[in-house]
Regions:
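Transmembrane helix segments
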Residues: 9, 127-167, 171
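Transmembrane helix boundary and interhelical loop/hinge segments in multi-pass membrane proteins
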Residues: 38-60
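Hydrophobic alpha-helical transmembrane segments of membrane proteins
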Residues: 14-44, 108-126, 179
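Transmembrane helix-loop junction
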Residues: 10-15, 47, 91, 95, ...
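Hydrophobic alpha-helical transmembrane segments of multi-pass membrane transport/permease proteins
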Residues: 1-15, 22-40, 80, 141-145, ...
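Alpha-helical transmembrane segments and their short interhelical loops
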Residues: 64-65, 70-139, 185-195, 206, ...
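Alpha-helical transmembrane segments of multi-pass membrane transporters/translocases
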Residues: 2, 6-11, 81, 101, ...
C-alpha cells in the first residue's frame, strides 16, 4: 500500500521544486516500515501468546530475551525489504536520484529510527485483547502517518495540529533524516527525542512483563 500511495501522490506533484520527491519517497518508506511494526509484529507475538508458545519457551534453553531478539531480527529483514522495494520504485519510476552514500545513510537512519515503531508495537501487545490491539493499532497507524507529516507536510495544518505533529516520532524521524541529507548534520533534538521515546516504551514493556510474571 505505501508503494501505491507513493506512486499516486508523487504523480500529482512531479513538478514540485526542491527535494519533495526525495522526501516523499522517504516518508512512504517510513510509512511502510511502520505498518510492519504496528500490525505484523504485534500480531505475530500475540499469536505466539495465544498458542502458549511463549509459555513453552520458558521450559526450554531459549530465553525470552533470545525469543524477542529473533522476532526483532525477522522484523528488520522485513524493514530491509520495504526499503528496497520503495527505494527501487522511487528511483526507477519517479527518477529520484541521490549519491550512493545518501541512499545508504537514509536506509540506516530509517532502520535506526524504526526502533520507535517497534517499541509502539510491543506496547500494543500489552493490551488485553486482539480486537483492542487491532483497533488501537489502526488509530495509531493513521494518526502517526497523517499528523506526523508522512502523507503531507504538516505546514498545511492549523497551528495547533502542527504543534501536535511535531511531538510525534514520525515527524522527528523525518526531521532527523532530512537534516542529515540536506545539511550533513545531526539533528540533536530529533535524535534525543527518538532515543528517549524508544527507551521509555521499552522500559514500560519490560516493567509490565516482569510485574505480570510475578503476579502469575
Amino acid at each position: 500500500m505505501p508503494t501505491a500511495f507513493y506512486l499516486f501522490f508523487s504523480g500529482m506533484y512531479q513538478d514540485t521544486p526542491g527535494n519533495f520527491m526525495r522526501d516523499y519517497l522517504l516518508s512512504m518508506t517510513a510509512f511502510s516500515m511502520m505498518s510492519t511494526a504496528i500490525f505484523s509484529f504485534p500480531t505475530v507475538l500475540e499469536t505466539d501468546r495465544l498458542n502458549n508458545w511463549q509459555k513453552v519457551l520458558r521450559h526450554t534453553p531459549v530465553s525470552m530475551v533470545e525469543y524477542y531478539l529473533i522476532k526483532v531480527a525477522g522484523l528488520f529483514v522485513d524493514f530491509l525489504l520495504s526499503i528496497g522495494v520503495v527505494f527501487t520504485v522511487g528511483h526507477v519510476v519517479r527518477h529520484v536520484n541521490m549519491p550512493i552514500q545518501d541512499w545508504v545513510l537514509a536506509a540506516f537512519l530509517l532502520i535506526l529510527g524504526s526502533l520507535a515503531f517497534v517499541a509502539i508495537g510491543l506496547v500494543l501487545t500489552l493490551l488485553p485483547s486482539s480486537q483492542l490491539m487491532s483497533v488501537a493499532g489502526n488509530l495509531l497507524y493513521m494518526g502517526l502517518a497523517v499528523m506526523g507529516g508522512l502523507w503531507m507536510p504538516i505546514s498545511v495544518f492549523p497551528e495547533w495540529m502542527q504543534a501536535i505533529g511535531k511531538c510525534l516520532p514520525t515527524y522527528q524521524l523525518m526531521e532527523l533524516i532530512k537534516t542529515f541529507l540536506n545539511k550533513g548534520q545531526v539533528n540533536g533534538f530529533a535524535s534525543l527525542y527518538l532515543t528517549l521515546f524508544t527507551l521509555v516504551l521499552f522500559t514500560l514493556v519490560i516493567v509490565y512483563r516482569r510485574h505480570s510474571e510475578v503476579r502469575a
